[in-house]
Amino acid sequence: MITTTPASLEVALYKAADVIRYAQNIAILTGAGVSAESGISTFRDKLTGLWQQYQAEYLVSIQAFEKEPALVWQWHQWWRGQIADKQPNPAHFALGEWQALAKQQGKTWTLFSQNVDNLHEQGGATVAKLHGDLGKNRCHDCAKPYDKAIAVTDTELKHCECGGLIRPDIVWFGEMLPQDAWQTAETAALNCDVLVSIGTSSVVYPAAGLIDLAKQQGATVIEINPNPTHTTAVDIVLPDNAGKILPLLVKALK
């Protein structure tokens, strides 16, 4: 981890603000670190309790659902229960405020996220969800949205009119990203003057490739992460929690 003094962090913060201030097109990528500050566990955290014998990576795979659909559905319902009471943190609210500020200034500002919760929306920001939305369901076979309300305590498998099983509308390992969300993110990365990567490990592809794409097009890349990734594409590192850095950054942009 990069060690910084308060003074050096302040210098990096204002350097980042200066770059962003003169940017017309701004792209934002968020990852699990942003949600972690609201108490939502990341996939790097070991499962506990009833689920400690399983690997999270297995439970979010298409292979697991096709082999053990009841198990996978039960785990996702448990996961939904875990995040149901979680609230946006200062990072989410700062992003919502930043989006409104950028609009006021006539700038293009695009947020795309690897997170499947709805904390960005609660914080006031519009977001393209690269890995889907845990709050929604769809048919595994025909992909038709399933709009009936399902309590997080309901662990019984549901079926679509076509006979297919209902599943969470998120991207599992082995699946393609949602086309609309990916197109939004890719277009933003191609056209941005600055890309800000927040709370992401920069190792989960294809989303992580958006950082390289922006860099190749000449964008400045800024990373906000308490554990910097040391990705070579990064120009400015702000090594602290998003909940601390983003409110300061947005304040500096006003």
Where are these regions (language model features)?
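Conserved catalytic core of sirtuin-type NAD+-dependent deacylases
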Residues: 1-254
